[in-house]
């Protein structure tokens, strides 16, 4: 069999507080009338900077790493250099290691009053399983240590946001992070039972988040399965750990916290057969809801939720699904 390894590379250069420059980055997917040959998709990347001191910054550099598979459009860079406004004095495109190219823009000045914005196109020439986030850094040529870095990525919900790949198997990472996001209003015990019993739902677990392993573009939530409420394809997960994989863009929305318990269910299509058991994708068909512990259940604001969970659990374990 094929050995599947998931590498957990942490983003080392976290966004540090920027003291000398204000920096923002905006990425949008665009449709060009005449895209260059071989381009599968095009984005516009706009970086805006302002100097935070009370004078303009003199010669400054904007250093842009490209998202995997993307290359900058030189025509749009030439226009920035040669236009009436002459936004940049020159640029350099460097092909980096492992196909992460970088683009260096030289600016004669960065104003301390107005933002200086540079906007150019980048084309996707080859598709990768997962587009890695990239970064934009601005610094003064003479004091390169005082730099400001921001990470950027294709916009939420973009088809380019792409897929989670392990080896040669890819799955879409939906922009819908988990199921309850699509429900408005109060969620009752009956609703939960009906949804957990819907066709396609494979398993229902109570699980504890024991470890979070972040990587460049997705998070691996290591969960210990406390209780199998409804048995699924994964034959004997109780008291064992399982990996639940989610797109990094969903981290805030999921807001999962270590050592908390969760009610989880998901569909068969989100199970991933691996040599040592199954991994699970967290996506728009995954229910992921905080399950308060005994102490938290005694707090008044959690009592209804805890009662609901007992009802759901008893119903599914004792009565089972109606279908």
Curated annotation (Swiss-Prot):
Domain NTR: 177-321
Gene3D superfamilies cross-referenced by the UniProt entry: 2.40.50.120, 2.60.120.1540, Alpha-macroglobulin, receptor-binding domain
Any one Gene Ontology BP term: inflammatory response
Disulfide bonds: 177-250, 197-321
One term under GO cellular component: extracellular region
Localization terms from the record: Secreted
UniProtKB keywords: Complement alternate pathway, Complement pathway, Disulfide bond, Immunity, Inflammatory response, Innate immunity, Secreted
Name of the protein described by the UniProt record: Complement C3
Encoding gene per record: c3
